[in-house]
């Protein structure tokens, strides 16, 4: 398989990715973090993993957070569209996919190689549920051998966080 790399990564204003990895012990399921620093996010937790993976996790059990990914031709993965022609697949959509209290959305690339171009990842709070605002979330991503992530604070249903990845 050809190597996969992110040539450029864009973040919303005031958001930074944590590129350093400090092992904290065994993998903790449902947090979108590479806890054991082996280059994989939430492996062994019932989620699919791939060379291109975008995952968001949140702790408020009644909240709904949406992870949407658009590919270079504009096809979108979201709660209504679970696959694109370019090979993106919505692997897990919580809480509707029976997530056993671990709220995650997970999008992976099932194709051998990504379509070249810009991928846009949008994370938004759909419903805070019975919890109070803000809702805390963590966005983790993997492109090839590069794994990173950031903590997010979602303050309202009008707010969204957009990230761009040039592959």
Predicted segments — roles?
Residues 1-51:
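Extracellular calcium-associated, cysteine-rich motifs in secreted modular proteins
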Residues 43-167:
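Intrinsic-disorder/low-complexity signal
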């Amino acid at each position: 398989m050809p190597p996969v790399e992110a040539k450029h990564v864009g973040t919303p204003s005031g958001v930074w990715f944590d590129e350093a990895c400090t092992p904290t012990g065994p993998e903790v399921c449902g947090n979108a973090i590479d806890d054991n620093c082996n280059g994989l996010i939430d492996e062994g937790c019932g989620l699919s993993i791939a060379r291109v993976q975008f995952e968001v996790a949140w702790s408020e059990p009644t909240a709904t957070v949406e992870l949407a990914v658009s590919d270079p031709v504009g096809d979108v993965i979201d709660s209504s569209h679970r696959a694109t022609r370019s090979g993106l697949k919505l692997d897990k959509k919580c809480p509707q996919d029976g997530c056993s209290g671990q709220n995650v959305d997970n999008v992976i690339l099932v194709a051998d190689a990504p379509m070249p171009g810009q991928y846009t990842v949008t994370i938004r709070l759909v419903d805070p549920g019975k919890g109070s605002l803000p809702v805390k979330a963590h966005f983790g991503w993997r492109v090839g051998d590069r794994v990173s992530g950031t903590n997010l604070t979602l303050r309202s249903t009008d707010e969204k966080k957009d990230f761009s990845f040039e592959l």
